[in-house]
Amino acid sequence: MNIEVLKKEISEVYQTPILHQTAFWSEVKSNLGIKSKAFEFKIRNSDLYTNTGGRSYTVSDFLVLIQQLSKESTIAYVPYGPEIEPSEENQGRFLEELSEIVRSYLPSNCIALRYDLNWQSHWGKDDFCDDEGKWMGPPQPNYQEFHFNYNTINWNFKKANTDILPVNTIFIDIQPDVNTILSKMKAKTRYNIN
């Protein structure tokens, strides 16, 4: 896999509907004391996607937030990026190589690079539903790590104990009146809304 990565100006980040990957978000975070860096990358589509040949490339970018943890350490964080989603069997390898390249642009005291990906969950398939079609939730973290590290060289991906950004989205029909919507919710959910 060959990825070309270039640092770019925050103001040149591509427009996207993903708020956390915009120049605006970088400015918001800057006002909170969090620094940002932007990177553009180019990769051959045959390295990203299975059953893709030819010489076509994908060019995309992503924003990295750098937060001071202590006087001695920082952490780099990529919220909902990178946007492009490789085929499942190429995801770990792609993210590993991208991370290794970006590492040289990060502060020397950076202790981790965290991604909260906006990719389709591996665990949302029918295999993770019970006989009634209800989702059983994700597997144990060690299984998730094993699955994501598949096809990587260093096996360095670790599942975070908590998620920063929402990982599951629920759609609510807002056509009915408020009382009807609330009546369909569990009592604890209603309590947390009110």
Locate the predicted segments by residue.
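Short N-terminal secondary-structure initiator segments
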Residues: 1-19, 114, 136-153
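Conserved donor-binding loop and adjoining core beta-sheet/short helix segment
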Residues: 31-136
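Acyltransferase donor/substrate-recognition loop-hinge adjacent to the catalytic core
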Residues: 141-194
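Short amphipathic alpha-helix that is part of the acyltransferase structural core
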Residues: 1-32, 183-194
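A short linear-motif detector with a strong N-terminal bias
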Residues: 17-20, 55-58, 62-63, 91-94, ...
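A generic short-segment signal for beta-strand/edge and adjacent turn/coil regions
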Residues: 5-11, 35-53, 134-142, 171-175, ...
